[in-house]
């Protein structure tokens, strides 16, 4: 199911996938599309609206059990989508078959891929990795996206980042079961949302722009789960955080500013 599965119509018939007798989950293509659109220049507000529509339309158990993807056997590789120019899609089939991102575009794509993975791993649902994405595999549409895993030639930097995300996700019941709340409107380029479970609170900040972004966090102390960097409150107004360009923070927050 490539779109919102709650109102899917196929062969002139409305599908009842979530009526209790058919599907427990689907591949979350709307999330994939929203992530890639946001990272390629879309707004944080549009991303949030897309996710809120899914949350409204899907049963809660389904929403928290979706296969959260950024790549599959039916789509171009995420690294390629995040690095190519619009005119590259017009290349001949033979050119696409042998295409590799030039060094400058590859570095841009790698930074964006890390942001995509952060969103994938921190939204409700089950993060599902298409083999090779975690190793820096490139490729346009089928069959170029189905090359074998690059054994011995993995991008070690990307692989290490994915491993760290897996550790953070596995260790956090808040990211697995917590409530979701978006906080948008402050900056089109800054995607900001919060996962909460009881007293546990994690704020995710994703800055897709090429400039740093400053934002406030209502906490006395925060720890970035990816890097273990600490942030302290300097006054009663909370913590002022500068998110570097094309960077994400996963902030476990403690306390509340007055």
Q: What function would you assign to each model-found segment?
A:
Residues 109-110, 122-129, 133-258:
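Carbohydrate-interacting/catalytic domains
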Residues 44-52, 88-113, 171:
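Aromatic-anchored helix/helix-loop segment that forms the rim or "lid"
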Residues 33, 75-76, 257:
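Short loop/turn segments at secondary-structure transitions that flank enzyme active sites
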Residues 57-64, 106-114:
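Structural motif
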Residues 4, 30, 70, 226-229:
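Residues at the C-termini of beta-strands that transition into short coil/loop
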Residues 15, 68-101, 117-156:
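Aromatic/acidic polysaccharide-binding cleft in carbohydrate-active enzymes
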Residues 1-66, 119, 136-164, 195-198, ...:
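Active-site-proximal helices and loops of the catalytic beta/alpha 8
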């Amino acid at each position: 199911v490539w779109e919102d599965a709650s109102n899917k119509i196929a062969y002139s018939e409305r599908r009842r996938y979530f009526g209790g007798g058919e599907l427990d989950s689907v591949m979350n293509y709307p999330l994939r599309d929203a992530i890639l659109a946001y990272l390629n220049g879309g707004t944080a507000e549009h991303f949030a609206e897309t996710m809120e529509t899914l949350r409204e339309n899907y049963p809660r158990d389904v929403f928290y059990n979706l296969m959260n993807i950024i790549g599959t056997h039916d789509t171009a590789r995420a690294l390629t989508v995040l690095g190519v120019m619009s005119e590259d899609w017009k290349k001949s089939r033979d050119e696409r078959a042998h295409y590799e991102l030039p060094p400058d575009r590859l570095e841009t794509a790698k930074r964006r891929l890390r942001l995509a993975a952060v969103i994938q791993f921190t939204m409700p649902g089950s993060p599902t990795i298409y083999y090779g994405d975690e190793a820096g595999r490139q490729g346009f549409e089928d069959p170029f996206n189905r090359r074998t895993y690059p054994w011995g030639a993995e991008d070690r930097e990307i692989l290490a980042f994915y491993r760290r995300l897996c550790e953070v996700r596995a260790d956090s019941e808040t990211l697995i079961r917590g409530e979701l709340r978006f906080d948008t409107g402050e900056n089109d380029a800054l995607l900001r949302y919060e996962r909460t479970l009881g007293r546990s609170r994690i704020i995710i900040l994703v800055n897709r722009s090429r400039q740093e972004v400053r934002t406030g966090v209502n906490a006395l102390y925060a720890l970035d789960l990816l890097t273990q960097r600490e942030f302290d409150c300097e006054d009663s107004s909370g913590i002022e955080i500068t998110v570097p360009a094309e960077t994400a923070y996963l902030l476990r927050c403690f306390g509340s500013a007055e």
